[in-house]
Amino acid sequence: YTFCVHDESVNTYGFRMLTSGANLEEYRKNPVVLYNHNDWEAPIGRGENVRVEGGRILVDVVFDEEDEKGRMIAGKVERGFLRMASIGAWPPEEVSDDPALKLPGQTGPTATKWTMREMSVCPIGSNHNALAMYDRATNKRIDLSDGQALVRLMDKKKQY
């Protein structure tokens, strides 16, 4: 299951984080997938193939199907009841209030250097673009590594 876990849009807290400033190495060393940022509970899976594509951070999630909660969350993702992911990051190492980095609606700073700590599958994340994507025609999950599927996803004429 491929999730977009981050893009550079303004989050619900009013700030944004530049993808170019992301340090993904700490996460790659311990690629836990949590449910709703609950780090006091066992992970529900692990992240693989952590990568940056087109200004977004994508992670392939492998759910722990041997774990009851992991299996339950995997089922909800498979059936389309959960589609969102969220990054858990350490407090930014560098931020900027440079107006050139601000987007419309942005009230807070821009994090220019930050470290990814974990990723979570969650009902509602603070970045509304951090989603698993589904094809409107088939209601099946889009494989973000499939170029043709992305073309269909972005072709607005065929969505309605």
Residue ranges with predicted function:
Residues 1-152:
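Signature of dsDNA virion morphogenesis modules
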